[in-house]
């Protein structure tokens, strides 16, 4: 995915004095994403994102998977490629079009060997027409099937498929900076934009959090290195203990 990516989420909500997970207090909106795209410096692409697990049906076939509402920019940011049909166009977002782009796993489970393009499946009770099929990506480094998903326009998700108590909100905003060098300044600019838009005072806490993918990757690498050293130490101790045990048995013999 590259290391010039930022992920912006709503900050944690508090329930009964207990701090919940990030994104539990919806504060980010589609308008926030538009403002970042229009005014933030050093930004190449911006993609609002929201998702739910939904039941898909086509004829007698059904499949449960993640359905994400977003824009064509998300496919660009996350390196998804449409190999048959087309991607989203601005009119799909503007008109809340009931269209979908699907991964290969979903295509196989619902349509078998048939070409899914122009077929109509149901997401819950909402009929949507398949306009695009994604190139196979296989499993991620964490073992997740990257082909088991459906993309629909963000506005369609908000207004016609998901339903929400917080109209216009999104779970996440993904941002791709123009380069790794531009990442830090873009992050600062986005931070200022969101604080202004959300009318957060100087003494008030942020109601959002920005995660730098480069920093996250370094944290993962550091954790993996620490775990490797720990496992090595455990193995060494096990060998030492085993060796002492064998030596004691030989001495007794």
Placement of each model-derived feature along the sequence:
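Hydrophobic, regular-secondary-structure patches
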Residues: 1-66, 73, 108-109, 181, ...
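Extracytoplasmic
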Residues: 3-5, 23, 31, 41, ...
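Short, flexible, glycine-rich and Lys/Arg-enriched loop motifs at helix boundaries
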Residues: 13-23, 165-167, 195-207
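Hydrophobic alpha-helical segments typical of transmembrane helices
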Residues: 32-35, 106, 153, 169, ...
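Mid-to-C-terminal secondary-structure elements
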Residues: 73-88, 97-201
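A hydrophobic alpha-helix feature that marks transmembrane segments and, especially
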Residues: 228-253
């Amino acid at each position: 995915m590259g290391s010039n990516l930022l992920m912006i989420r709503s900050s944690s909500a508090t329930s009964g004095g207990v701090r919940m997970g990030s994104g539990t207090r919806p504060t980010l909106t589609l308008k926030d994403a538009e403002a970042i795209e229009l005014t933030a410096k050093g930004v190449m692409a911006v993609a609002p994102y929201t998702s739910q697990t939904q039941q898909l049906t086509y004829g007698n076939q059904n499949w449960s998977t993640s359905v994400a509402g977003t824009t064509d920019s998300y496919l660009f940011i996350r390196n998804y490629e449409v190999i048959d049909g087309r991607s989203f166009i601005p009119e799909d977002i503007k008109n809340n079009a009931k269209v979908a782009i699907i991964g290969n796993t979903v295509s196989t489970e619902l349509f078998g060997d048939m070409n899914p393009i122009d077929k109509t499946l149901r997401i819950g009770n909402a009929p949507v027409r398949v306009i695009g099929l994604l190139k196979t990506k296989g499993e991620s480094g964490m073992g997740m099937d990257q082909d088991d998903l459906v993309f629909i326009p963000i506005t369609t998700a908000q207004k016609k498929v998901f339903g929400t108590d917080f109209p216009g909100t999104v779970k996440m905003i993904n941002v791709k900076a123009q380069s790794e060098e531009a990442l830090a300044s873009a992050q600062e600019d986005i931070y200022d934009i969101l604080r202004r838009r959300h009318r957060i005072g100087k003494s008030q806490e942020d109601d959002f959090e920005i995660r730098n993918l480069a920093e996250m990757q370094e944290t993962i690498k550091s954790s993996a290195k620490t775990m490797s050293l720990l496992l090595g130490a455990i193995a060494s101790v096990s060998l030492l203990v085993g060796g002492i045990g064998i030596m004691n048995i030989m001495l007794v013999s």
